[in-house]
Amino acid sequence: MATTNDLKNGMTLDLDGELWNVVEFQHVKPGKGPAFVRTKLKHVLTGKVVDKTFNAGVKVDVATVDKRTMQYLYREGDSFVFMDTETYDQYHIPAQTVGDAANFLLENAEAVVALHEGTPLYVELPAAVELTITYTEPGVQGDRSTGGTKPATLETGAQIQVPLFITTGEKVKVDTRTGEYLGRANS
């Protein structure tokens, strides 16, 4: 149990039996009337974002979320199998829970899995990963009608936009949050 004055970004709240992550918060002290806290909350399971206002000092339930480092092993049907690197327990996590992180997951890659009472909530990847381009069209010198980028397929099957000078077989850095090309990998 905490108060709204203790809110921080990334905190997970239990509101009416549902889990919400605090995306943004702002303490507001108007000239007239009581202080309040304006928040932007993201539903952990659905990803829905809502604005919610709390009176300052009101008690809220903080959910205990255990973030554990896990290794991605393989995909089995509609679920991804992760292994806890400390206990060696295996978790079958549905594709819906993994979300967009699936586009950048390679076998044996490490990720942080958030657990609430033993149930996986979401998967966090590092901010950037290095992946190999499996296919891209050759870039033609002087072809600028597309703004200097072209589509490329990664070894995970995901498609991203890369500069014209990138060729098939090259390793590139990709931002896992936006799916954008960051540069060539330092290998």
Swiss-Prot record:
For the biological process aspect of GO, one term held by this record is: peptide biosynthetic process
Does the record's keyword annotation contain Lipid metabolism? no
The record's principal subcellular location, in a coarse class, is cytoplasm
Q: State the UniProt keywords alphabetically.
A: Cytoplasm, Elongation factor, Protein biosynthesis
Signal sequence region: none
**Belongs to which family?**
Belongs to the elongation factor P family.
The record's annotation in PANTHER family points to: ELONGATION FACTOR P (PTHR30053), ELONGATION FACTOR P (EF-P) FAMILY PROTEIN (PTHR30053:SF12)
Q: Which NCBIfam families match?
A: efp, PRK00529.1
Q: What is this protein called?
A: Elongation factor P
Q: What is the name of the gene encoding this protein?
A: efp
